[in-house]
């Protein structure tokens, strides 16, 4: 009677809905593992689940007066992690056919993300051979019964959804010690919990996700700022997006790829959202690619119109781009400010009140953005991402990292770079965090000062950029940082050590590719291992395909919700080439993406990048990694820049060429360094060439196309 009344009350107050695979709850041995969002969670499960479960409750809580009062309504057993008999009792209950509920986090979330997963729940599942039924509770965190006060906008009666996910099992891990078996079972359960979160993510477009964040975190919460130092709230950014979107649609057609040549600024974010809401597909153009690279990108995407800014072209000294590229129409945003009519202003005002009506009909699977590869190995390719793939990567990041609305991001990587776009713009916007957009990562003195001045807690960049920030920053500039993430290139040991020694901060290395929106793997405080790029993100499948001549690791192929829709190539303008990959048996499988990277995994699932397939030299029949060559050079001269490439060799097939900024570096030093590292003599180049500065791409990576061309030109050798 009491439970019936509570069910009616909770359904009325919170529009509570139970959905999903309810049949799995009726199996004989069932362990239900919900996430923990509020003090309501236990009551919600007790009154809405179609079975009567036994709740495992920590003994410190079960002894409280309110739990004793609920004893007649709810079955629960005290759980003491320090006493093995508690676990044995739960295993026995499951064996008797009683459904058991354990909250694996052990506490209510204070971040909105998953908290630490205790190993005990996973070990109970493995020991009892139970059917594990993941269950997601969504919405309860916004009630006054949650613990996110000051983090999210509280609501008295939010909608609460209980989703039962497909059942799975946790086999008993094979390990010699019970402690290791317990830990591995806990890691397996953690993976199940992360996959459950990914499974219930909403099906939205970018604009819909932005509006949902605006509702969730507050219409007037500051969310974005640039070098004008005028923060915009979600409503302020919405207003600008409506204005820019209204203008952009005059010069383009629905579904058209629209070029954006703009810096890291609030207006760029507004242009992305504005174009997206009106059914246009923003194509982020790399202004460092030069006339040749930009022409290739425009041709591949059949882009007819490019929106840019006179002020940006002036400050960046980029007028050679519109002057050298005449096949497209250039539209300058400054010229359009005064073109808004009274009708346009009324349209903007009306859609500020009813913003959902501003979006033209779209599906999450539709094209949302075009990003271009760096062109480090040839022509830039257009990478078309859907709303679904971009937002899936944002959700994957939020699943493993505990970003909250209290965080402040420093985003200096350009928005035409996938890392800068997803991690530097979409992730903070969808998380309720505040982001500061800065137009250049190369200002090594200014960026640290802004991190200090704006109280930033999250910084990301390439190893090169982070190393230079550390050189010029004051030790107190980074005092508030809690996440420093390196990606886009291998994190150098001296950069890692400098940050730890000078600032006491551990850099978390990650790995990504533009085609995966871009983050594939990342170290996080909950799961980190030096000299790896972390574990593959939840929701993704991975496999290694063997490569002849390479013994350790294999070619990494990926499949998941964050994979691109396809390529746009300059050879076939406008034609979308869907991803597919050779499975190693000569069969092309659609949906898989071949990264071209040689990767290995350790026993804990941590990923180590060995190098790109194209960055291996075949010398006298032996495969030599060019990254090993660069590692040898860095070990011999760690304060200079080095890049290795190849040139044809009539006798041995290919020969190594090392470009360096160290005028004193000799082959004898490289030989000594190779012996220290245990590297083969075959990896020591004979051709060493001095450059005052390595040619770099806009992302900070070496320009290997230019270096390869330089290597094939005859030049005096230094041995």
Swiss-Prot record:
GO biological process: fatty acid metabolic process; phospholipid biosynthetic process
Membrane topology type: Multi-pass membrane protein
Transmembrane segments: 258-277, 409-433
Region (Acyltransferase), start-end ranges: 15-138
Localization terms from the record: Cell inner membrane
Molecular function in Gene Ontology: acyl-[acyl-carrier-protein]-phospholipid O-acyltransferase activity; ATP binding; long-chain fatty acid [acyl-carrier-protein] ligase activity
EC nos: 2.3.1.40, 6.2.1.20
Keyword terms of this UniProt record: Acyltransferase, ATP-binding, Cell inner membrane, Cell membrane, Ligase, Membrane, Multifunctional enzyme, Nucleotide-binding, Transferase, Transmembrane, Transmembrane helix
This protein's GO CC annotations: plasma membrane
Main location: membrane
Purpose of the protein: Plays a role in lysophospholipid acylation. Transfers fatty acids to the 1-position via an enzyme-bound acyl-ACP intermediate in the presence of ATP and magnesium. Its physiological function is to regenerate phosphatidylethanolamine from 2-acyl-glycero-3-phosphoethanolamine (2-acyl-GPE) formed by transacylation reactions or degradation by phospholipase A1.
Family: In the N-terminal section; belongs to the 2-acyl-GPE acetyltransferase family.
Official protein name in the record: Bifunctional protein Aas
Organism of origin: Erwinia tasmaniensis (strain DSM 17950 / CFBP 7177 / CIP 109463 / NCPPB 4357 / Et1/99)
UniProt gene name: aas
């Amino acid at each position: 009677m009491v439970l019936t009344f509570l069910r009616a009350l909770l359904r009325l107050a919170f529009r509570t809905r139970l959905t999903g695979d309810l049949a799995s709850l009726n199996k004989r041995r069932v362990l239900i593992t919900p996430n923990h969002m509020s003090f309501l969670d236990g009551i919600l499960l007790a009154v809405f689940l179609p079975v009567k479960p036994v709740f495992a409750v920590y003994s410190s809580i079960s002894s409280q007066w309110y739990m004793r009062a609920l004893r007649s309504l709810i079955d629960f057993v005290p759980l003491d992690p320090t006493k093995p008999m508690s676990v044995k009792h739960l295993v026995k209950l499951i064996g008797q056919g009683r459904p058991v509920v354990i909250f694996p986090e052990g506490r209510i979330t204070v971040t909105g993300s998953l908290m630490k997963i205790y190993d005990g729940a996973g070990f109970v599942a493995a020991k009892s051979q139970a059917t594990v039924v993941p269950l997601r509770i969504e919405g309860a965190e916004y009630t006054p019964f949650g613990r996110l006060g000051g983090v999210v906008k509280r609501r008295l009666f939010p909608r609460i959804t209980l989703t039962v996910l497909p059942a799975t099992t946790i086999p008993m891990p094979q390990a010699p010690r019970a402690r290791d078996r317990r830990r591995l079972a806990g890691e397996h359960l953690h993976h199940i919990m992360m996959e459950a979160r990914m499974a219930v993510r909403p099906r939205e477009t970018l604009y819909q996700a932005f509006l949902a964040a605006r509702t969730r975190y507050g219409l007037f919460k500051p969310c974005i700022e640039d070098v004008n130092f005028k923060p915009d709230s979600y409503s302020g950014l919405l207003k600008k997006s409506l204005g820019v979107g209204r203008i952009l649609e005059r010069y383009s057609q629905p579904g058209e790829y629209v070029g954006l040549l703009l810096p890291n600024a609030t207006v760029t974010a507004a242009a992305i959202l504005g174009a997206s809401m009106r059914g246009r597909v923003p194509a982020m153009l790399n202004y460092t690619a030069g006339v040749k690279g930009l022409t290739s990108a425009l041709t591949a995407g059949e882009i007819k119109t490019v929106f840019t800014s006179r002020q940006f072209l002036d400050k960046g000294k980029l007028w050679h781009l519109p002057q050298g590229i005449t096949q497209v129409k250039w539209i300058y945003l400054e010229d359009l400010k005064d073109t808004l009519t009274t009708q346009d202003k009324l349209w903007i005002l009306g859609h500020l009140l009813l913003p959902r009506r501003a979006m033209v009909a779209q599906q999450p699977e539709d094209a949302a953005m075009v990003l271009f590869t760096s062109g480090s190995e040839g022509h830039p390719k257009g990478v078309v991402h859907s709303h679904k793939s971009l937002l899936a990567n944002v959700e994957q990041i939020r699943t493993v990292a505990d970003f909250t609305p209290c965080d402040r991001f420093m985003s200096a990587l350009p928005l035409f770079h996938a890392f800068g776009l997803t991690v530097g713009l979409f992730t903070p916007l969808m998380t309720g965090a505040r982001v500061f957009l800065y137009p250049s990562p190369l200002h090594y003195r200014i960026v640290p000062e802004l991190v200090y001045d704006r109280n930033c807690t999250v910084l990301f960049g390439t190893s090169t950029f982070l190393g230079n920030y550390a050189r010029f920053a004051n030790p107190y500039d980074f005092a508030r940082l809690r996440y420093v993430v390196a990606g886009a290139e291998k994190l150098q040991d001296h950069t890692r050590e400098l940050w730890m020694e000078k600032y006491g901060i551990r850099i978390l290395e990650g790995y990504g590719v533009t085609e995966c929106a871009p983050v594939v793997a990342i170290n996080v405080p909950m799961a980190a291992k030096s000299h790896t790029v972390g574990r593959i993100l939840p929701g993704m499948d991975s496999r290694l395909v063997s490569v002849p001549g390479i013994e350790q690791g294999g070619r990494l192929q990926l499949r998941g919700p964050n994979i691109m829709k396809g390529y746009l190539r300059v050879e076939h303008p406008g034609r979308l080439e869907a991803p597919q990959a050779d499975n190693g048996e000569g069969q092309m499988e659609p949906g898989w993406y071949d990264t071209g990277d040689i990767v290995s995994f350790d026993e804990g699932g941590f990923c180590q990048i060995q190098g790109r397939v194209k960055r291996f030299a075949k010398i006298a029949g032996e495969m030599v990694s060019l990254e090993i060559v660069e590692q040898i050079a860095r070990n011999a001269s760690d304060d200079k820049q080095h890049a290795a490439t190849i040139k044809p060799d009539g006798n041995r097939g290919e020969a190594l060429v090392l470009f360096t900024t160290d005028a004193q570096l000799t082959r004898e030093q490289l030989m000594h360094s190779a012996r220290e590292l245990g590297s083969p003599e075959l990896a020591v180049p004979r051709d060493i060439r001095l450059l005052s500065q390595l040619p770099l791409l806009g992302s900070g990576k070496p320009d290997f196309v230019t270096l390869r061309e330089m290597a094939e030109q005859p030049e005096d050798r230094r041995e």
